[in-house]
């Protein structure tokens, strides 16, 4: 490793070094990563040097910016790209370094009347999120975030720096748009931004006992919602606090008018933050933690939201989970994305999250099993969690195509995504 240390401008940590444990710790503090070394890349040349060194010496590299999707990574070189966080916007196109976060992109794009297909958190890395497809607030209107990718600057499994477009390498370009990080290390992404001249959004909140009414209104609103409107239903329970039910929404426009009227008719709301807001404030709607936390989560895709599903969701308290959320999908997501992400025909997504403690997995198991007749079995790659496999994110044809590409481009397994397309995570 001393050879690698002399090749890079960034930092290298080895086990026993001061700062090693901090450097190897991902955003999800419940995940342990007993890696062989950590490289903090100062730029694309450091990425190339690290991958080239690994290829030469039979080592494996796992790349993370923030580590939101991290899983246990044993014996690998952990390549940190968080310092590569530049964001540039010109002519409706954003260029984001491998470590750039969505909050940076939205802050730069919003004043121009533009947005990217960002998720609920401003501190998630653009690259990791987009490589996995990227399922966010505006996906009903604009599809997967990966569908907006125009070009990627990458380091391949030999350590060579390459620019990838639909014309230069159509197969790799296809894979990078939703197939994960198994095929190359992305050092920069270029993607088209989408119009958002005015954004309306916020959260409505009620005591937990109003959950049946709120869920009924959610079913009514989402049954006929235009693609500009996205609504999420939340059951919330935090330690030491009473249970709550909430609805989060965004609307690409100034006023959704009657579209949200069924929620207003419920009455008894104890909070309502709905307003026209800057694109840069998108993360304030859900107000998710922006500091590292230990947590466990799971996602299921729902084939519908009929009375049986509603009854299962409301049957029991959600403790010890923090949040049981149902997201409305549909719209542009049902149409082909042009990349490995494909399309999502399921109309709703169930997201469960809780503390990394005994009882959390069991509670998620109970709800997942109750909903088995109403789930498709597929999971979006961008929302896989520890213990799950990439195979569950793709249909058989897409998975076979990704595996063929992996074997052809990285036959020695130099690169390893959090959820590898070959084998298990």
Q: Positions of the model-derived regions?
A:
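Soluble FAD-dependent oxygen oxidases
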Residues: 1-425
């Amino acid at each position: 490793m001393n050879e690698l240390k002399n090749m890079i401008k960034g930092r290298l940590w080895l086990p026993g070094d001061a700062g090693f444990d901090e450097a190897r710790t991902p955003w999800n503090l419940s995940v342990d990563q007993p890696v062989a070394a950590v490289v903090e890349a100062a730029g694309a040349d450091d990425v190339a040097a690290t991958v080239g060194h690994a290829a030469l010496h039979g080592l494996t590299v796992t790349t993370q910016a923030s580590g939101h999707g991290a899983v246990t990574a044993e014996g690998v070189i952990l390549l940190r790209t968080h310092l590569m966080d530049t964001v540039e916007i010109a002519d409706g196109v954003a260029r984001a370094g491998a470590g750039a976060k969505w909050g940076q992109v939205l802050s730069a794009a919003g004043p121009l009347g533009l947005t990217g297909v960002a998720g609920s958190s401003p501190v998630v890395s653009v690259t990791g999120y987009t490589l996995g497809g990227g399922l966010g607030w505006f996906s009903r209107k604009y599809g997967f975030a990966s569908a907006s990718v125009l070009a990627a600057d990458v380091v391949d499994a030999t350590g060579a720096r390459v620019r990838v477009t639909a014309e230069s390498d159509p197969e790799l370009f296809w894979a990078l748009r939703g197939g994960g990080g198994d095929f190359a290390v992305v050092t920069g992404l270029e993607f088209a931004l989408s119009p958002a001249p005015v954004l309306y959004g916020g959260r409505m909140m009620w005591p937990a006992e109003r959950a049946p009414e709120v869920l009924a209104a959610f079913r009514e609103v989402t049954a006929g919602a235009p693609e500009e409107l996205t609504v999420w239903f939340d059951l919330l329970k935090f330690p030491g606090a009473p249970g709550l039910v909430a609805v989060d929404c965004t609307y690409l426009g100034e006023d959704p008018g009657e579209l949200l009227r069924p929620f207003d008719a419920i009455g008894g709301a104890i909070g309502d933050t709905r307003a026209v807001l800057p694109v840069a404030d998108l993360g304030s709607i859900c107000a998710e933690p922006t500091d590292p936390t230990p947590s466990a989560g799971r996602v299921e895709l729902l084939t519908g939201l009929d009375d049986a599903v509603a009854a299962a969701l409301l049957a029991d308290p959600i403790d010890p989970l923090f949040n049981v959320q149902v997201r409305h999908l549909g719209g542009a997501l049902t149409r082909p994305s042009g990349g490995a992400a494909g399309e999502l025909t399921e109309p709703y997504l169930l997201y469960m999250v809780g503390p990394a403690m005994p009882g959390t997995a069991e509670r998620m198991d109970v709800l997942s099993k109750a909903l088995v007749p109403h789930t498709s079995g597929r999971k979006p790659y961008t929302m896989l969690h520890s213990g799950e496999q990439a195979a569950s994110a793709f249909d058989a044809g897409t998975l076979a195509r990704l595996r063929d590409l992996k074997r052809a481009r990285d036959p020695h397994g130099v690169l390893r995504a959090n959820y590898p397309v070959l084998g298990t995570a």
